[in-house]
């Protein structure tokens, strides 16, 4: 490797002259932090993508010293291909300095995810020193060691990239990373072809730019409305706390009453010796036992519990316990509001979520919030996960389009059930979808033996819960818990009856579950989606439910990504990607272009689904909106 460290305009122009002759470039960045809206690009590393060069020239551009980067935008944006590792990150930083690369991408991180999805390796816990099987890492360090048998240090990754003079170790570290990429890519390309994963990777690569833009744009937030919501939830929490404490205190025997302030009011706080903390399960369980209230029991430990899951499925008419249940829900909602406020970017004034387009081994997106480094110890933390923002109107109406824009919100209707009907070949479901029947009502009618027009609202809700819970082979005990979490508390006997009735209604589904069970009998299997996406199921992942889930949810991921990839050619300042949540896409469009882009979004999503759904109709609903609540 021959390293050119560039710190002057003269050196930059010479490098540009040489780089313009290279149509395909390896690219990497070193930045002062992980937030592209707050931090800066310190180094930009560029070199040829040719894997067989005897001596590769790596250009390391110091963006702090070369303050005039004129010419960089045209150079990068005109390349035939960019090769990098986890380019979602680098593209966000390039966008921040005005560079929007729109051509072919080869991302060694995404390629590795395609190749090793679900694969595991022996690892040792640093705390307990126990050996376990964990996910194979796709970090550059791990990929280099696995593919090239070269061990590299990443110590410099967390060094100070903002200081005026960089160490030679930092510069060499930056150059070395980009120098290894062509060899990795060569090995991956060969394996992608051998494993019939070229088309899957091609799809994944087309999603990278739209996802980087999604992270870059973020959600516009009505801060005033969020603060009003926080005040409202705080008031509700105070009232719920008072009602719960008063109810509990009134039932406690003399000598066990809740602690008091000098004025006689109940002392509520986190000082366990002097105050009562209604958020402390230990304190609450003790007092509930003193008043003789039955509490849920954790099946794993055999001990009483007040966890949200346990409370949600515990049938009780105890007033005090139900007041605690209500208080817990409000406290959780308040925590969500506070997290929204904490994660509004100080530079953009927007909320930027981080997306991993291959976050789940099934191929589905994951959102983990914006990644950032805080504190003297350079601790990595994550911001809000946009997928966890409550669906309630009062939350979603806080997310609004930019001035002069409208939201276009589109999602697939019952896409997992439609995919199951198609891929599993469930005749009753295929017939229902083609006739435009409500599948949840159909399920209820088959279980309760009534006409579909006679199904009552609670029965339809039961049908809906069954459809989503039992699709992947959930047992009746887990179904009881799932039903309670959906707001319908049932007995174990009722869960067992409904479970059996569902499988009588859809015998092909039960047969498919048996087929999936047989696939994992040996403790491992490969599952492929209709597009060829592959996932290895092994060790504790080799279950029937995971085998079923991977086919359906993996196909759903394929459909959504085909839509995003095809929408890439339409993306510009008039039409911008904002978010993806499960099967939903949110875009911003200029007001005068909103209806035009609504049609484009709806059409692309329908056509994407039709690549897999041949016997079942696609239903995709899109609408123009003033807030995220207007879905």
Regions found by a protein language model. Name each.
Residues 25-27, 105-106, 278, 407-411:
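Short hydrophobic beta-strand that contains or immediately precedes a catalytic carboxylate
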